[in-house]
Design a protein with these regions (language model features):
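Short, Lys/Arg-enriched, disordered terminal segments
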Residues: 1-5, 112-114
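Short amphipathic alpha-helical interface segments
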Residues: 3-38
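Short amphipathic alpha-helical interaction segments
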Residues: 6, 37-54, 68-69
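Short, flexible helical or helix-coil boundary motifs
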Residues: 14, 18, 22, 41, ...
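A short, conserved structural fragment
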Residues: 52-63
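Accessory beta->alpha helical hairpin/"wing" motif in late/C-terminal subdomains of nucleic-acid enzymes
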Residues: 62-84
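Short, amphipathic alpha-helical interaction segments positioned at domain boundaries
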Residues: 76-104
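Short acidic DE-rich linear segments
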Residues: 104-114
Length: 114
């Protein structure tokens, strides 16, 4: 698995985890987390679209002519997939600083905030 594939898979699990905790008003939140908090430039809308097609999350569609999805929540199928596969996620640790690596683990649900 390439570094890009590992990062995409990791982002998928971040989306599943956070949307299982509570309904996410806008997918812009994920863009902010990935870009600002973690320094990852990725098309979160494409990942969300794939997760919707797979039945792992649901959304009320796009926000008026924008690339952002509204009201995103994890389905039971998504929660089960997350629970069964979260420990298989490979975090490309060399890609992140120590502080960002801690944030990755927190967003993945593998570590509690201190």
């Amino acid at each position: 698995m390439s570094k890009e594939e590992k990062i995409r898979e990791m982002c998928k699990f971040i989306i599943l985890n956070l949307s299982s905790i509570r309904v996410i008003d806008s997918s812009y939140r994920f863009r902010n987390i990935f870009l600002t908090s973690l320094g990852i430039l990725i098309n979160e809308s494409a990942i969300i679209q794939d997760l919707i097609k797979e039945g792992m999350i649901k959304s009320e569609g796009l926000i008026d002519k924008s690339p952002f999805y509204k009201f995103i929540s994890c389905t039971e199928k998504g929660k089960k997939y997350y629970d069964n596969n979260i420990y298989k996620v490979i975090i490309p640790e060399s890609y992140f600083s120590e502080k960002r690596l801690d944030l990755v683990k927190i967003f993945l649900g593998l570590k509690r905030p201190s």
